[in-house]
Regions:
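Class I S-adenosyl-L-methionine
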Residues: 53, 71-75, 221, 249
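Short phosphate-binding loop-to-helix
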Residues: 2, 62, 68-128
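Short, high-confidence coil segments that cap the C-terminus of an alpha-helix
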Residues: 58, 104-105, 133-136, 225
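N-terminal glycine-rich phosphate-binding loop and ensuing alpha1 helix
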Residues: 3, 14-64
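Conserved alpha/beta core of the MobA/IspD/sugar-nucleotide pyrophosphorylase nucleotidyltransferase superfamily
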Residues: 2, 8-10, 182-259
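Conserved core of the sugar-phosphate nucleotidyltransferase
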Residues: 118-207
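Hydrophobic/aromatic residues located in beta-strands of well-ordered beta-sheets
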Residues: 20, 61-63, 108, 139, ...
Length: 259
């Protein structure tokens, strides 16, 4: 493993240190080399890194990868790098591997490397929620989605929450009448964990709900973990295909805000 090059983005607090990790892999089956694909004049991964740096409250931010091509490009734009093993089968595995080397970290963020329009303000709110309430062991982000056609798609993950803002269920299906303006929210693939829960989560085998829905967060739901859902201002989606990337290129970027 090569030495890491962490870049601090806030004021470290050993009691509540927040570690942000952006997992990135080169060999995506639908879009090989996706993190390095150019978007608005920069590698897509750089947009994620820059938006994550704008978010407040993250004490250390690193990109986790097992590919030297990604590491080389990321170092060139100033990112901290953590080289992970080839054994990681998911982004969460990479995040957990980094977290094992950071025993001081209290909260660990999993920030997807294919979300170039990451909402910095929502990440700030998620970090604030985790810092403010030690009883929250896992958190995520969701948004109101006005595009009902999008909410009808199985490619869009929905979540319904209870009166206290905790997730009841996540699904790709038309959950709670989402396509008809029902109460379901559009889920964003950003997660915050207390470090002990993250390490435990990574050791759990996939559950039946996770396998049925193809949603990793249901592994926690099945185990009785309460997931706090922070409401963001505007939906943002990941890039899965070259066609989606081309559509973003044509449309242009949304504004960045730290909250």
């Amino acid at each position: 493993m090569l030495p890491s090059n962490p870049v601090p983005t806030g004021t470290a607090d050993n009691r509540r240190a927040v570690l942000g990790v952006i997992p990135a892999r080169y060999g995506a089956s639908r879009f090989p080399g996706k993190p390095l694909a150019m978007l608005w004049g920069k590698p897509m991964l750089q947009h994620v890194w820059e938006r994550a740096r704008v978010a407040r409250g993250i004490d250390e931010l690193v990109i986790a990868t097992d590919d030297e091509r990604i590491a080389t490009v990321a170092r060139a734009f100033g990112a901290g790098i953590e080289m992970t093993s080839l054994d990681c089968t998911s982004g969460t595995d990479r995040v957990a591997e980094v977290a094992r080397t950071r025993p001081h970290a209290q909260v660990v963020l999993n920030l997807q490397g294919d979300e170039p329009e990451l909402e910095s303000a929502a990440v700030t709110e998620l970090v604030s929620a985790m810092r403010a309430d030690d009883t929250i062991t896992m958190g995520t982000i969701a948004h109101h989605e006005p595009d009902l056609a999008a909410m009808a798609s199985e490619n869009v993950v929905k979540v319904v929450v209870d009166d206290e803002g905790y997730a009841l269920y996540f699904s790709r299906a038309d959950l709670a009448g989402a396509s008809r303006g029902g109460p379901a929210l559009r889920h964003a693939g950003v997660y915050a964990f207390r470090r002990p829960l993250l390490l435990e989560f990574a050791s759990w085998p996939p559950g039946k709900l996770e396998q049925a829905e193809r949603l990793e967060q249901l592994r926690a739901v099945e185990r009785g973990v309460r997931i706090k859902v922070v409401l963001g201002e505007r939906p943002f989606a990941g890039v899965d295909t070259p066609e989606q990337l081309a559509a973003l290129e044509r449309r242009g970027p949304q504004a960045v805000g730290a909250g």
